[in-house]
């Protein structure tokens, strides 16, 4: 296969697999490869798709070809290609072909088809070209990165996330619980971990559509939520007003760094740390500490790597199509950085299985509302979401990604915290 002229199906096979596998590959030149009776497969439909595969070998080239419609998946719904991705991950060895094999691919495709071409319009610019928006994790560049992902369409998010409009890991009280029950349970758990009582003050940074803001306000807590997404802030503030919670809560369109108020009884960060940048953790956690009164509590909820050695930067697909400038590290690094700013870490736990279940339900919602979603954001963007959520589900199931809660407190100079000796919340 690696010395003679290759068919297009064989080229597709090279870029996705090695050895025996349960997939069927077909291509626009009429060629086939793989297992004939396989229920799952990939179809390379155009020469442009071959160009994407050859000029960006690996996940980015595959994503470009898939999002553009030049590569089609069979046996799965585009809103939830989980079974295909799981099969590829578990039974196929993804690889970057050797230089010798790539040279043969070039000869087979033809030199005219290996010159770089424009990626799909859904793709963000590479990191080096984002300098026009400011330095990495500057306020202007962070705002643009958040806009790329979170300002897609509130209607679209309502279809995918469901009534809770909560775009973070749910906490399932049991395997049979619905997504809505699990999201409500997550807010309940965070509320209890933070020991909030009526009249207390909470700052929720990266508040999204205000789910935690409204939950806490319903229980009598005064809350400020801050989000960089204009669409989220508009939706969240309206939801606050519609529930009659304006006397207690507000959702601001604001960088968390622009919150001037201090002396909060608690700070929650639910899904923001992923956007901060690892090098900025000292400032970030120091800033959150500065917002707390002495004795106040911080709950940091974020996606992490499974170890503390892997690179913090996202892969090509995630960085270009999902979370531009997003960075992840291990829970050990998160805990260390929280301790380094002088906060005392009280408790930590991992919810990775819960995130896999959350993503399962989000994909189910996307499939259910597929026609509406495509009409709202277009087929390529809808496919990006199905691909990214299903791939993330596989990553959490395989322990490549985790979701951690870290609870910490701002002790007084003598080390007093006035906290119970044992955990005070219901699991």
Swiss-Prot record:
CDD domains: AdoMet_MTases. Its EC number is 2.1.1.-. Keywords: Lipid biosynthesis, Lipid metabolism, Methyltransferase, S-adenosyl-L-methionine, Transferase. GO terms for cellular component: peptidoglycan-based cell wall; plasma membrane. It comes from the Bacteria. May be a S-adenosylmethionine-dependent methyltransferase involved in fatty acid metabolism. This is Probable fatty acid methyltransferase Rv3720. It comes from Mycobacterium tuberculosis (strain ATCC 25618 / H37Rv).
């Amino acid at each position: 296969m690696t010395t003679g002229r290759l068919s297009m199906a064989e080229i597709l096979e090279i870029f996705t697999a090695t050895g025996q596998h349960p997939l069927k590959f077909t291509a626009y030149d009429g060629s086939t490869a793989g297992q004939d009776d396989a229920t799952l497969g990939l179809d390379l439909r155009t020469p442009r798709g071959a160009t994407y595969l050859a000029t960006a070998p690996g996940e980015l080239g595959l994503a470009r070809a898939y999002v553009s419609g030049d590569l089609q998946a069979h046996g799965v719904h585009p809103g939830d290609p989980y079974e295909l991705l799981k099969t590829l991950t578990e039974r196929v060895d993804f690889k970057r072909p050797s230089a010798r094999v790539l040279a043969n691919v070039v000869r087979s495709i033809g030199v005219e088809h290996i010159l770089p071409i424009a990626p799909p319009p859904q793709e963000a610019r590479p990191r080096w070209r984002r300098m026009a928006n400011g330095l990495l994790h500057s306020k202007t560049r962070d705002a643009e990165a958040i806009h790329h992902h979170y300002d897609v369409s509130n209607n679209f998010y309502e279809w995918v996330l469901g009534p809770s409009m909560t775009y973070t890991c749910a906490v399932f009280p049991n395997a049979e619980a619905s997504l809505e029950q699990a999201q409500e349970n997550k807010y309940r758990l965070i509320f209890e971990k933070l020991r909030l009582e009526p009249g207390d003050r909470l700052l929720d940074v990266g508040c999204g559509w205000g789910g935690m803001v409204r939950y806490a306000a319903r229980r009598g807590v005064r809350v400020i939520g801050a989000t960089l997404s204009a669409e989220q802030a508009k939706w969240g503030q309206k939801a606050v007003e519609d529930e009659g919670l304006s006397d207690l809560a507000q959702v601001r369109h604001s960088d968390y760094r622009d919150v001037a108020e201090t002396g909060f009884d608690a700070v929650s960060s639910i899904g923001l740390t992923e956007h901060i940048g690892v090098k900025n953790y000292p400032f970030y956690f120091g800033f959150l500490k500065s917002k707390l009164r002495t004795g106040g509590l911080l709950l940091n909820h974020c996606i992490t790597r499974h170890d503390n050695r892997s690179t913090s930067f996202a892969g090509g697909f995630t960085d270009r199509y999902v979370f531009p400038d997003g960075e992840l590290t291990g829970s050990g690094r998160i805990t260390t950085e929280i301790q380094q700013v002088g906060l005392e870490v009280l408790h930590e736990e991992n919810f990775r299985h819960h995130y896999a279940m959350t993503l399962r339900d989000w994909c189910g919602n996307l499939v259910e509302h597929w026609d509406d979603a495509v009409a709202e954001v277009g087929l390529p963007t809808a496919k990006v979401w199905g691909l990214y959520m299903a791939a993330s589900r596989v990553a959490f199931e395989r322990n490549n990604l985790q979701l951690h809660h870290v609870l910490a407190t701002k002790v007084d100079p003598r080390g007093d915290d006035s906290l119970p000796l044992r955990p005070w919340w219901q699991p």
